[in-house]
A protein has these predicted regions:
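Catalytic pocket-lining loop regions of alpha/beta-barrel enzymes
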Residues: 3-14, 118, 132-224, 276-290, ...
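Histidine-centered catalytic micro-motifs
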Residues: 27-37, 150-154, 181
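Conserved, mostly hydrophobic/aromatic
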Residues: 31, 52, 81, 85, ...
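Divalent metal-dependent hydrolysis catalytic cores, especially in the metallo-beta-lactamase
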Residues: 32-33, 37-39, 46-70, 91-97, ...
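Acidic-and-aromatic substrate-binding clefts and catalytic sites of carbohydrate-active enzymes
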Residues: 36-44, 68-74, 98-105, 126-131, ...
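Generic structural signal for hydrophobic
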Residues: 51-55, 111, 142, 167, ...
């Protein structure tokens, strides 16, 4: 792998991220994993801590992957995570992963007694619905223990909004973190749960447009930075969150809340902050070349994740050609830096060792392309109604 190629292409994005990050702001990654997944991906403690260092992240929540040794009841993966977090000198906050079909209350109680400070549920991996009889028990356990539940709400699932919303509204004291910007049902979930005082949304997703829409629908105080390693990187996930937060017009205090302060307050027992109004419906206006570069480059990401390298390279080639287009315009500097990142990413895809840095560059290039133009409020759509103002939940701990 050509390390210098990666470093040179990365430099302007690092400088941009430093410019956007509020001084002295804590960075807290709400969604990370340790261990082994059935799909072959894995992450060990030193690597995760190194990735957090690269992002300047102080702390992170962590839980098991879909471990091949998860039977029975995720007990072995949960114990491993508890051991690793004990070795992290306080940087990692352990969540236990529960399977609703395998004694979830007994395993949850066992893990909470051993120091777990949250619960992870994955309805796609564990193939469950939120209308099952065991779900009220899990939510009641979290309410009583005053710990949050992080729920996979990303790709690969049928609609979950109605069952999850009904369940959450029966448990008004529970704190939920809906992962991946709740893209599986974002519109319905954000609408039905607007008045629930304890629903957060994490930013771990690939497409910036999903986050742009989330910031329009949800108060900034209910959005928390997350990166989902080993599938994402904390550093590039933070860059995406910073770019979209700035694009949404957030000030430094609000951005600081998104990237760390809200999660820090939750796990430290200081409660969730009161909410402001959502930013409201907006139009996303990109100049032609940026729109084309974004479109082609964003198609390369899923192809790379799926191992379809030639397909990804084809999309990268098209995006690079757009960035080389000499037409005049006010996005020249951005397109030059985006193009350099995509050229480097294309070269790095030629080796297996280069795929991870290639994805990092691609992720950042897509984030910048989608957020380079200033946001504009729609002239035809009214603002999305704000959630009811929520009082700080000083008794809520994780």
């Amino acid at each position: 792998m050509n390390a210098a190629l990666y470093t040179d292409a990365l430099a302007p994005f690092l400088a941009d991220g430093k410019r956007l990050r509020p001084a002295n702001a804590e960075v807290f990654d709400a969604h990370t994993h340790l261990g082994l997944d059935e799909d072959g991906r894995s992450l060990d403690l030193p690597t995760l801590l190194s990735q957090l260092d690269d992002a300047g992240a102080n702390r992170a929540c962590v839980f098991p992957l879909h471990d091949p040794e998860r039977k029975p009841a995720y007990s072995l993966p949960n114990d491993r995570v508890l051991t690793w977090t004990d070795e992290s000198e306080g940087r990692l906050i352990p969540f236990c992963r529960l399977d609703p079909a395998e004694a979830p209350l007994a395993e949850g109680e066992r893990c909470l007694a051993k120091g777990a400070r949250g619960i992870k549920l994955h309805p796609r991996a564990q193939a469950f619905a939120f209308d099952g009889p065991e779900m009220d028990g899990i939510f009641s356990l979290a309410e009583e223990a005053k710990v949050p539940i992080l729920i996979h709400a990303g790709r690969g699932m049928p609609p979950i909004a109605d069952g999850l919303a009904d369940l959450a509204l029966r448990h008004p004291e529970v704190v939920l973190i809906l992962a991946h910007a709740a893209i599986c049902d974002q519109g319905i979930l954000t609408s039905r749960l607007a008045d629930h005082p304890g629903v957060l949304y994490d930013t771990s997703c690939f497409f910036p447009i999903d986050l742009i829409e989330l910031f329009a629908r949800v108060p900034a105080e209910r959005i928390v930075f997350a990166s989902d390693p080993p599938y994402g990187l904390s550093s590039s996930g933070l860059y995406l969150a910073l770019r979209v937060a700035a694009h949404a017009g957030l000030d430094e205090e609000a951005i600081g809340g998104v990237i760390g302060e809200t999660m820090a307050a939750l796990v430290d027992g200081r409660g969730l902050p009161p909410v402001s109004a959502p930013r409201g419906a907006q139009q996303i206006t990109l100049p032609g070349r940026l729109a084309r570069a974004y479109g082609y480059a964003s198609l390369a990401g899923p192809a790379m994740f799926a191992g379809a390298v030639e397909q990804a390279q084809g999309m990268l080639d098209l995006a690079i050609a757009v960035c080389r287009d000499p037409q005049p315009g006010d996005s020249g500097e951005a397109l030059e830096e985006i193009g350099a990142a995509l050229i480097a990413a294309r070269a790095l895809t030629e080796s297996k060792q280069g795929m991870r840095p290639a994805l990092d560059l691609l992720f950042r290039a897509v984030a910048r392309a989608a957020t380079e133009a200033p946001r504009s409020r729609s002239t035809t759509e009214p603002p999305i109604p704000p959630a009811r103002d929520a009082l700080s939940r000083s008794g809520q701990t994780a």
